[in-house]
Amino acid sequence: MSNLYATEPATNGKVIIDTTAGEIEVELWGKECPKAVRNFLALTMEGYYDGVIFHRVVPGFIIQSGDPTGTGMGGESFYGEPFEDEIHGRLKFNRRGLLGMANNGSRNSNTSQFFITLDAAPELTNKHTMFGKIVGNTIFNVLNIGNLDTDKEERPLIPPKIRRIHIIENPFDDIVPRITAEEKKAQQKAKLEAKKDMEQRERRAKAKKNTGLLSFGDSEEIPEEEVTVKKKSMTRQDLVDPSEAEHTKSKTSKMTETFVNIPPSLKDLGKSRENEASEEKKAVDLKNIRAQHEREKAGGSAARQAEIKRMEEDLRRLKKRSGSVSDSESDSSSRARRKGPSYLEQELAKYASKRGRAAMKAGNKRGRRDEEEDVLTEMRKFSKRVMQAGDEPEEEQAEEIEEGEAKEEGTGIGAAMAEEEGGIEVDDDVGWLTHKLKFQVDDKELTRRAEDEYAVIDPRAKARDLLGKPDKKKLKGNPNRRTVRNSGRNR
């Protein structure tokens, strides 16, 4: 099987077909089949395949989709007309998981329908355009679709549906879709709404007249009304001869009076149909849909810009806030105009209420930097106290520590902590400052030390001592002995 893969050219496009039966990962041959791949990708960009079912399943052969009508007789190409086949010598239907274009049985009749093979199908080679292949473990999702139950017409009883096709790699960056997927959805929604409105109006029109209760309902004639249109005379009666006025009046009345025999029901029906047609055309019109989308985007961007400006103004006010009366007045007036604090001020108020409760109770409104400096100062004092406690006698240390604790209780952190605890018993024992860590003496440790402290005796040194021979190393290190030996030789 590996030699079959080796003969196929490299792919340059990739899509993922998201279906109700799972994802199907497809790689496309855009170089070998440019028209088929371009048609498939363009229809995908337009959302043409969204919601389309697999209308044909032949176990052991193919599964087929791409018809929005779901009958197998529909579909259109991106080019507006069927396009020709693209047969390549190295692309053959010799295994499962190959993607091809479906046609109506004749050559060069490709539109939007496609199929995926479930096994080798050599009878399709040189008759259908093969423009892609299934890769990875997603082939098993294709096989699951191929195992569905079908009726006599090879239609699955519960047909799976394509949710959407995601384009991962597009070899043709110059594709400009005729309509976007969002616009297509809006157009279809408008069509359905217009169709529902038309059906409801037809039902209402039929319900108004019930001739079934009359014995002559079928042969009832629609009553006719004579509609007369009269015009007033534009002459002055006091300046015209009476006989001549009567003559002209009768003449003009004959010319101006027109009798139009129009049944009222036909009038209403014609008007309603004209209104329905105009409303449906208006709802489905693509230009109106695009204009509406642009208006919604413009309105959303304007509201977003207004919110950004408002947030910037709030930030400027917070930076300038220094506790002055003018700033407080401007803030209060702006809050009155906004009918409440902004979101940013509310969040800052939450954090301010949680931060430094003891400092707020004592009336201390210093900034965060001052608080950090105070904390560091207290830590330095504490470390200094601990260091001094190790050098002084225990009695003096206890007295100094008690004095320091008394001072802290009078002012500063000790008072704030006392107020905060509200009568809770405080542990004021300061003996731990002079405490020393002492480990229990272990017999095993003493034994180990005794073993390590054994004296090492050199037997050669002991032998020299017994024989009375001098040590060469000692002689080298003592020059007096050397001179004595030399003087002895001279004698």
From Swiss-Prot:
The residue ranges flagged as biased composition, category Basic and acidic residues, are: 186-202, 268-298, 306-316
**What sections of the sequence does the record tag as coiled-coil?**
277-327
Disordered: annotated span: 186-427, 464-491
Its domain of life reads Eukaryota
What's a single GO BP term from this record?
A: protein folding
* Reactions listed under catalytic activity: [protein]-peptidylproline (omega=180) = [protein]-peptidylproline (omega=0)
Q: Which residues form the PPIase cyclophilin-type domain?
A: 11-167
Low complexity: compositionally biased ranges: 323-333
Biased composition of type Basic residues is found at 352-367, 482-491
The record's Pfam families line, in alphabetical order, gives: Pro_isomerase
Q: Which UniProt keywords apply?
A: Coiled coil, Cytoplasm, Isomerase, mRNA processing, mRNA splicing, Nucleus, Rotamase, Spliceosome
Residue ranges with Acidic residues bias: 391-406, 418-427
Its GO CC terms are: catalytic step 2 spliceosome; cytoplasm
Entry keyword annotation includes Amino-acid biosynthesis: no
Question: What EC number(s) does the entry state?
Answer: 5.2.1.8
Quote the InterPro entries the UniProt record gives. Answer: Cyclophilin-like_dom_sf, Cyclophilin-type_PPIase_dom, Cyclophilin_A-like
Q: Where in the cell is it found?
A: Cytoplasm; Nucleus
Describe, as the record does, how this protein assembles with itself and its partners.
Answer: Associated with the spliceosome.
The family annotation for this protein states: Belongs to the cyclophilin-type PPIase family. CWC27 subfamily.
The free-text function statement in the UniProt record for this protein reads: PPIases accelerate the folding of proteins. It catalyzes the cis-trans isomerization of proline imidic peptide bonds in oligopeptides. Involved in pre-mRNA splicing.
Give the protein name, as stated in the record. Answer: Peptidyl-prolyl isomerase CWC27
